[in-house]
């Protein structure tokens, strides 16, 4: 019985870490912008992975990051833009 109570206690003490997608913000509270010169390069992926995301790419001229930690600050945007950017080009192309 003590083991069952201890197990339940431990289950509730262990936090669940989830990931989120979005436009990560820099230390000024602004998202990283991408342009015609770096839209296809590694710029956004580098910015996102430095921010502890799994990967990132340029979407609507702003760097969009996948699997950011819960504590990462992201730009609050409308659902339609987020849904559009949630489909990674690398996921679509393979």
From Swiss-Prot:
- Describe its function: Binds voltage-independently at site-4 of sodium channels (Nav) and shift the voltage of activation toward more negative potentials thereby affecting sodium channel activation and promoting spontaneous and repetitive firing.
Gene3D superfamilies associated with the record: Knottin, scorpion toxin-like (3.30.30.10)
Disulfide feature: 34-85, 44-63, 48-65, 59-85
Q: Give the source species.
A: Lychas mucronatus
Q: Which UniProt keywords apply?
A: Disulfide bond, Ion channel impairing toxin, Neurotoxin, Secreted, Signal, Toxin, Voltage-gated sodium channel impairing toxin
Q: Where in the cell is it found?
A: Secreted
InterPro entries referenced in this protein's UniProt entry, alphabetically: LCN-type_CS_alpha_beta_dom (IPR044062), Scorpion_toxin-like_sf (IPR036574), Scorpion_toxinL/defensin (IPR002061)
Q: What is its main location?
A: secreted
Domain LCN-type CS-alpha/beta, by residue range, is: 20-86
GO terms for molecular function, please? sodium channel inhibitor activity; toxin activity
Q: What is known of its domains?
A: Has the structural arrangement of an alpha-helix connected to antiparallel beta-sheets by disulfide bonds (CS-alpha/beta).
Tissue specificity comment: Expressed by the venom gland.
Q: Which GO terms describe its cellular component?
A: extracellular region
| CDD domains per record | neurotoxins_LC_scorpion (cd23106)
Give the similarity note. Belongs to the long (4 C-C) scorpion toxin superfamily. Sodium channel inhibitor family. Beta subfamily.
Give the signal peptide as a residue range, or say none if absent: 1-18
The protein's name: Neurotoxin LmNaTx45.2
What high-level taxonomic lineage is stated for the organism? Eukaryota, Metazoa, Ecdysozoa, Arthropoda, Chelicerata
Name the domain of life this protein comes from: Eukaryota
């Amino acid at each position: 019985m003590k083991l069952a109570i201890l197990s339940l206690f431990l289950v509730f003490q262990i936090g669940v870490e989830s990931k989120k997608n979005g436009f990560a913000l820099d230390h000024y509270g602004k998202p990283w912008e991408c342009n015609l010169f770096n839209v296809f390069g590694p710029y956004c992926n580098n910015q996102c992975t430095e921010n502890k995301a799994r990967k990132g790419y340029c979407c609507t001229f702003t760097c969009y990051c996948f699997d950011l930690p819960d504590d990462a600050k992201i730009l609050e945007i409308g659902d339609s833009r987020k849904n559009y950017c949630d489909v990674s080009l690398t996921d679509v192309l393979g």
